Amino acid sequence: MLELKQVGKVYQREQQTFTALSDISLKIEAGEIYGIIGYSGAGKSTLIRLLNGLEKPTSGDVLVNGQSIVGLSEQAMRPIRQKIGMIFQHFNLLWSKTILENIALPLKLAGVGKKERLAKAKEMLALVELTDLGAAYPSELSGGQKQRVAIARALISEPAILLCDEATSALDPKTTNSILSLLAKINQEMGITIVLVTHEMDAVRRICQRIAVMAAGRVIEEGTTQAIFETPQAEVTKAFVSESLVITPSETAASIEQLLTRVPEGTIIKLRFNEEQSSQPVIGQLMRRYPSVEVSVISGSLQQTINGALGYLYIQIQASPDDLKQALSDLSQQTIEVEVLRHG
């Protein structure tokens, strides 16, 4: 559906060159929700502009449905762009037009008759659950409602692809969740490929099947949502995952130090587990099996991803050397990832 092959993008600015993207290779399958995450300046927005042909790469190739769009003229790009919808952080609505007129605008520009385009706009209003607001104006709507209007407008031309550039960044958490649920519903009911570009790990965790992590113009890690959260490799990815799981490194370190002031003995361990393991009484089993084992919970978190639950648990174990060794072995045999952070 969408593919980038060794794409690079370099800008020339006042006798200086700025490399926005370097050697980007991605393949986004038809019908999936694909997340692209990175901090500001990572190159996310440049990448999304390459996907819809608003920018041309300096090197490499961009393919839409197997067709290279790099060398196409503006005229040749028009029918391709009609199948690519896009929403932004800012809603870009026309304040002097009603909500129905805003949604119908792409069809008006395409020469579709008034009766037909307004009928289609009403269908889109129903899809985004704003049926009663067709006669309202943008100034009367909340931020979440405005983004729903922007989504309806992007979908009215029946695109096969929806590009979302920081679409939830200006919204509060509750509204963000409602927009993400709407995008998931659209993907499921209409089969539209969605590319979600964001700096919010919680957003990609909730609805994306796969994720690419960007930093300094490169893709530094890519994989399924489950794999990225369970075993992040790059430091940037680990930071994103920690933020999403509400276990920041500084908070964890502070909790560990606080515990060690009270109980200086013991081994500090980080456990990482998935949905199946989260339902097992792991700690209770350890304490029953090894009478000398005492466990203190430092901090933990369990979150849902589209592929299932995953979580972290930081614990302190006090035990005899033999029991500790055997307990760690038992945990590992249950496919729980065990990381010893500090020996007692």
From Swiss-Prot:
It comes from the Bacteria. Keywords: Amino-acid transport, ATP-binding, Cell membrane, Membrane, Nucleotide-binding, Translocase, Transport. It holds the Pfam family ABC_tran. SMART domains: AAA (SM00382), NIL (SM00930). Its EC number is 7.4.2.11. The keyword DNA-binding does not apply. One of its GO terms (molecular function) is ATP binding. It is an enzyme of class 7 (translocase). InterPro entries: AAA+_ATPase, ABC_transporter-like_ATP-bd, ABC_transporter-like_CS, ACT-like_dom_sf, MetN_ABC, MetN_ABC_transporter-like, NIL_domain, P-loop_NTPase. Belongs to the ABC transporter superfamily. Methionine importer (TC 3.A.1.24) family. This is Methionine import ATP-binding protein MetN. It comes from Latilactobacillus sakei subsp. sakei (strain 23K) (Lactobacillus sakei subsp. sakei). The gene is metN.
